From Swiss-Prot:
Catalytic activity, reaction form: ATP + H2O = ADP + phosphate + H(+)
Binding site for Mg(2+): E641, D778
Record-given protein name: Reverse gyrase
Free-text comment about domains: Introduction of positive supercoils requires the cooperation of both domains. The helicase-like domain probably does not directly unwind DNA, but more likely acts by driving ATP-dependent conformational changes within the whole enzyme. A beta hairpin in the 'latch' region of the N-terminal domain plays a regulatory role in the enzyme, repressing topoisomerase activity in the absence of ATP and preventing the enzyme from acting as an ATP-independent relaxing enzyme; it also helps to coordinate nucleotide hydrolysis by the ATPase domain with the supercoiling activity of the topoisomerase domain.
SMART domains: AAA (SM00382), DEXDc (SM00487), TOP1Ac (SM00437), TOP1Bc (SM00436), TOPRIM (SM00493)
Family assignment from sequence similarity: In the N-terminal section; belongs to the DEAD box helicase family. DDVD subfamily. In the C-terminal section; belongs to the type IA topoisomerase family.
Domain Helicase ATP-binding: 92-255
Zinc finger (RG N-terminal-type): 1-41
Origin superkingdom: Archaea
Amino acid sequence: MEVPLVAYLHSCPNCGGPITSDRLASGLPCRECLPDGAKAGSIKQVITALRKRKALQGLAWVEAYLRGYEEFAEFFKRIVGFEMWGAQRLWARRFVRGKSFAIVAPTGSGKTTFILIATLYSAKQGKRALLIFPTSALAHQAYKKLLTFAERGGVSLKALAYHSLLTEREKKEALEALERGDFDVLVTTSAFLPKRFELLSRYKFDFVAADDVDSILRATSKNIDRILRLLGVSDAVLNTALEVINLTKQLRKAEVAGDLKEVERLDQEMAKLRAKLREEVQRLKLGVFVASGALAKARRTVRLLLFREILGFDVGGRAEGLRNVVDLYVEASDNVIEQTLALVKRLGPGGIIYVQDRELGEAIVERAREAGLAVEHFFRPRRGVLESFERGELAALVGLASSRSALVRGIDLPHVIRYVIFVGVPKFKFRVRLEEFSIPAYLTFLYNVRSVLAGDARYKADRLIGQLKRLAPYALSVQEALKKASEGAELSSFDRHAVDVVKSAVEFVNSLLQNEEIRKAIETSSEVKLAYIDGEMYVLVPDVTTYIQGSGRTSRLYAGGLSKGLSVVIVDDPKVFHALKRELSLRFDEAEFKHLGEADLDKILADVDRDRKTIRDIMEGRLVPAARGVDLMRTILMVVESPTKARTIANFFGRPSLIISEGIPIYEVSTGDAVLMVTASLGHIYELPTSLNKIDQRQREVLAKWFGDFKHGNYDGENYAVIVKEYGFVPVYNKIWRCRGAVYVDDIDIPPGCKPLDVLEAIRNIAVEVDTVLLGTDPDSEGEKIAFDLYLGLRPYVQDIRRVEFHEVTRRAILNALANPRGVNFSLVKAQIVRRVEDRWIGFGLSKILQANFKNPNLSAGRVQTPVLGWIVNTYEESLKNRVYNVELQLNDVDIRLQVPRDVLDVLRKKKRVAIKLVARERRQVNPPPPYTTDELLRDAVNKLGLSADYAMRLAQDLFESGLITYHRTDSTRVSTAGIAIAREYIVRKFGEGVFKPRSWGEAEEGAHEAIRPTRPIDVEELRGLVNAGVIQLAIQLTKSHYQLYDIIFRRFMASQMEPSVVEVAKYNVEIDGHVIQLERTVGVAYMGFQTLYQLTPVEPELPTGTLDVVIKRYRVVRRVLSQADVLALMRQRGIGRPSTYAHILQVLAKRYYVYVTGRTKLMIPTKRGREIFRFLKEAFGKLVSEDRTRLIEQYMDAIEVGKARYEEVIAELYDEFRKEVLPHLAS
């Protein structure tokens, strides 16, 4: 038979039995379900073949789903006139599966059309539907379109409409029909729900669609409860869900208040209640709810959690993290009103003018009228004015530059708004008074001033920033608490905490401004301005949120991308503008202000207008998908390893919607040209079981039927989960089962009564709905193997599965990866499989021998582990033979340390005198070290930070997945052009152009790997401030150790891009009774260069010369013991191990108690057990575990990775070695 690369247990998509990789790669079920020779090009053909053989089992649900989808797709095409595209296909797939969901898609993606067709499809099947629109005009338009569609589709439809545009007679007739239940569909507005809910509640609706979720909340948040009841949710279920939500709210407040006892109580109570809720919901046959539109931040009421708790999804927010805006600025002239109107004339219609106060806005409108310009104010919503603006009758609208302004958040006209003008830099201006307190203003102030604070003041600022950030989601509750406190009303524990924090913030800011030294530092800083108006001090800081939201009106997502917009800031305050630029650049990598005079306005406006035309054509139906020849809104599922990475990626594109698939969270966002879902595999999804005897009997029987006897000579593949036949080798992988926080690879170990989490099934459940799956696992052989397993596991369900690779988790890197997918690299996969099989044969085999000989089941051995243990043992034993001493001497006021043998120490103790001679003094150029590789980072983490290697590796993983550093498993020192640009920005800003010296390092290295470096030009103090202030929002909470590790990565990288240092070096001979010791000391620095950031050669005082009396301060025997840092250096130098295994090897040695780790520098001292184990392995298996053989095997693996060695030949050689060197010992 043809040799499959691997076999997988429990993985046939149809029967759940074993299956080989070749079958999965062809999209086929196992050969038990379909015999060899079966051909299939799609899952539909597979299902047809299975049904013909009467073998259809696990794929039966897919058959029903595909049938429903095809019926819906044909129905859609018949009515609309063209096929569904991108996002519509995704929504249709969910709809026919009876799933409720949020529609995450931009203007022109066909949301309303889909909702109307889904409504007709439901009605055709005898189901009842309810459509809710935000306005009467939209409801009327949808109703008319629904009737047109019904006529086209030949659907007999009883449709009702109720809204304010109807006549009184029409309203009466509609209500009477509603009373009689004589309808299939009701089209109405969000205002109708609370007014007529008693009437509506008589009916259960099978399909409910809300065209604008935000409008539902504006009417009343209780509309959420009402919609759920209309879907069939009982009062009991609703009340249970509300209890869960209330407990969640209490839990968060208890966490904010620091009440740990209450947190624990609420946590336990909530877990029980959630389990009860899940049981109740499963008993109900609920209708389908489709929530269209995003939520304004202010609308994110906790009642929205009802959707998550009952329907399994969460509604997302607006994609304000996406922008395609040209940011320009110009200095304010003496007459800013005339300057503004001149800009309006130059830029044309479709403008918004943001002003700091109403008085200036009204003056601009009045002067515009005098000049014949059609400009109106929009300080409050004015429907007629907005409609005139949309029709092009007004050139611009004037509104307040505030995040609460109707023109900043309450307007979305992507086909109309072309540009915005900020008359003055948007800013917070406040006096430090309790009654003027604002969380955003104080957060901005504290973040911007922390850089001029030191010691206790900075600590207090950071603490307050953290407390205010945690209170920010409860801003309204905080204001209510302040009001209650001022009135002397009774306060809850949360109220008291909020009031205490606010008072502390106001008092602290006051104390800063009253401190003359700090006030002067603030006044001379470039981030905060203090202004004196009518004798009172005001604080001025940039309002970045308003700028982002306001300028974002010009750049909106639509079905085709992100429209281009223009923003012009008339700068009235250079200092506040500088702070605005700085913070904007930290939030958006691409953001950069250019002077208006340097911009090509004609080209910019041409690009802006091209997008507006496209948007209008889509909105008015003149541009259908086929006209472009491309699928504008493709649907993508990206699978990464960790939930942290998944959340980080999703958050690049706005506040994601959330879907829960069998306990696995999937984050959904729109990128403009795609609907992107991101989820995590939780690491590897397959592993070799410890023995085939420990898997399900049926699985084992099927394998035996295919491969025959598992034995091959004296080798029994059942013991190693690797089947060996004359025709080749077949590793057998089992699913990794997750149950109650534990992980299992053997079936028999799963606890009774526990239904394990099947990650692959959860991902399959979502993958079947999308067009494309992208596998975004780590860029190394381990990540490639995970991608390979996912590819095979999903292949029967999805035709288009590709691999994406990124070495940093940044928005730029993710977009580049999305645009450049590739296939799975089978050379990397094969190398990883060989490593795993080699470890199973050699490591597992040697471990069994050790366990038998030493009668200890906890012992282990491995090819890499053993020579590393040997270095530790040999070094330690050598130190016992040749004893030397560290001696610390004091001569005059200078201390020196020497290393001397015992006889010299005896002379020194007796005479207490040394002779010191200055041999030479020279200036020496010291070049910076290259940026970190994995081993170097771990060495410094151990030596400088006192962290263990495995803990440092976990911290680095967190930093990578949070988007703060590049990939941390690397042996490359190469720096990309993007990395050099980051270094340039930081170094020039901090130290000037002259210190910057770009180096790409590692020019001769192959591949795309790069050194470990930061992804942004922000040092650790800036990072701490940005995280505390909420400017940078991460998926995890950073600890002190995270910051420490980031700091050394940042400093090392920046140093690698700086000028060399020039130091003064003194060379001495120290003579003790004829024994001469040579010393070198750096005694001065002529030019700091890179050592400004990264001290490589600390300066020591010069030594006095001549014959000197000394005081012996201390001495001790030097036991030459390797530290973790020393071992890491040896592993890299001698080619033993890989970046991904360095820390793991050290961890295993300590875990098995072969060494114990002690001290800040993590010295590795061999134990008696460790020494005995090494001696045994060296004597019995010296050749097998020798350093040379281990290095050669590593070279084999590397050669497989790059396609220079054949997988089959290497694994055959390893098997031969195992059979000759290890197997005889096991047999005996």
